[in-house]
Amino acid sequence: MDIDKKQILDPSFKDKNNNSFQVMMDWEKPYMEKCIQTLNPFGDVLEIGFGMGYSATAINKYPIRSYTVIEKDKDVIKKFNKWKLKQKTKKINLIEGLWQIKIPLINKKFDCIFFDDSPAPEINVRSPRHTLFVKLILLKIVKHNTRLVSYSTSATPCNISWSSSDTYNKHINNSVICTSNKFKIKIPYFCRYAKGNYMYVNKIVFKK
């Protein structure tokens, strides 16, 4: 990854115009902080993707018991390790790798989860990433009243694509409460992954 104070770029992953993939930009900071305010972290917290550390910093301002992040990128992990040195009062854990591989190996349940990953070209699955993520955490790491807030450019609280034959279909419909709130923010014209003047704070509460 190419990381500076303004953005994170992934030169190994090109778009159709051969531009380095935009992973994250500094304009997102107030939106990320709003996401964490909505999550209202407590207990054991899991984050998917460390990014520029905006959400991690916000999470660790709350009286949580532990903070765990799953992160795949070596350069972002270096940034995480520097950040961790400043966080002396919390139990902080790093799981290095792809969440698609690591979540099935976790033997712990979490109270709060924040999901803001980036595409992983090395993972070849047909399901949308968020759908796959919810399936995996339902099996392994959520408990009654676990809260999930997800980064989103659209007002789709659950953002889950279940087929009519999917065994999760009935279960998910009966076991979650979904909400979505619009967040006004100026998105720069050169951002390729979000457009307009709004982002969305999408929240799921699991009632399993």
Regions found by a protein language model. Give the residues of each.
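A generic alpha-to-beta junction signature in SAM-dependent methyltransferases
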Residues: 39-40, 63, 140-144
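Conserved SAM-binding motif I beta-strand of class I
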Residues: 66-71, 150
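Class I SAM-dependent methyltransferase Rossmann-like catalytic core
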Residues: 1-42
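S-adenosyl-L-methionine
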Residues: 72-106
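C-terminal substrate-binding/active-site "lid" region of AdoMet-derived donor-dependent transferases
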Residues: 76, 83, 121-208
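Conserved SAM-binding loop of SAM-dependent methyltransferases across substrates and taxa
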Residues: 52-64
